[in-house]
Amino acid sequence: MSLGILGTKLGMTQIFDNETGTAIPVTVVQAGPCTVTQIKTSETDGYTSVQIGYGDVKEKNLTKPQLGHLKKADAAPLRHLKEYRLDDVSGYELGQAITANIFEAGQVVDVSGNTIGRGFAGYQKRHNFKRGNMTHGSKNHRLPGSTGAGTTPGRVYPGKRMAGRYGGTKITVRKLEVVRVDEEKNLLLIKGAIPGKAGNLLSIAPSNIVGQK
């Protein structure tokens, strides 16, 4: 696995291909800057990884253990911490800044984040069930219909698709293309849609391509 970066979704826009004039839908992401807050090695932790922090926060909003952990890296108070497992951590040091320049245009990345929470939703909205007739004497408009058999088994099987909370879950959208990198402003323009609303916390990491390291 390669080192990724934490960022914030800013919104969507479109850019145009200089050669063909085709409109490309892109999501603008504020990628970092992040700070290396911990380096784990096989000798001390049993595996190798790099932990990074993102998002300035007031000191009073963190606990003393959290502040003590960040102080070891001489890092400012940071809201979010995330760890990326690596094969080799020799090129990183505590307090090192991680910015958008670790990516390049044309690179393929995986983006993780929380989807938009829609609250308690019904069958049509949550599972795309077909509704019943609205006229001709029908009394079944947006009801689920049968949820199972009768006496046997005499219960509803676990996992039955029913109404409930919809969205607000963490997902990963894989193999999205980085269209453009703005190193001065630490912006990434990623082709396509990304989970969540504007302001959502994201983790962006290089995709694992079969046959490549």
From Swiss-Prot:
Q: Which family does it belong to?
A: Belongs to the universal ribosomal protein uL3 family.
- State the Gene3D superfamilies in the record: 3.30.160.810, Translation factors
> Which is an annotated GO molecular function term of this record?
rRNA binding
- One Pfam family assigned to this protein is Ribosomal_L3
The source organism is Picosynechococcus sp. (strain ATCC 27264 / PCC 7002 / PR-6) (Agmenellum quadruplicatum)
Keyword rRNA-binding listed? The answer is: yes
Q: What subunit structure does UniProt give? A: Part of the 50S ribosomal subunit. Forms a cluster with proteins L14 and L19.
Q: GO terms for biological process?
A: translation
What's this protein's function? One of the primary rRNA binding proteins, it binds directly near the 3'-end of the 23S rRNA, where it nucleates assembly of the 50S subunit.
HAMAP family xrefs? Ribosomal_uL3_B (MF_01325_B)
Annotated spans, Disordered: 130-161
The organism's lineage? Bacteria, Bacillati, Cyanobacteriota, Cyanophyceae, Oscillatoriophycideae
Q: What is this protein called?
A: Large ribosomal subunit protein uL3
Q: Name one GO cellular component term.
A: cytosolic large ribosomal subunit
Q: Which InterPro entries match?
A: Ribosomal_uL3 (IPR000597), Ribosomal_uL3_bac/org-type (IPR019927), Ribosomal_uL3_CS (IPR019926), Transl_B-barrel_sf (IPR009000)
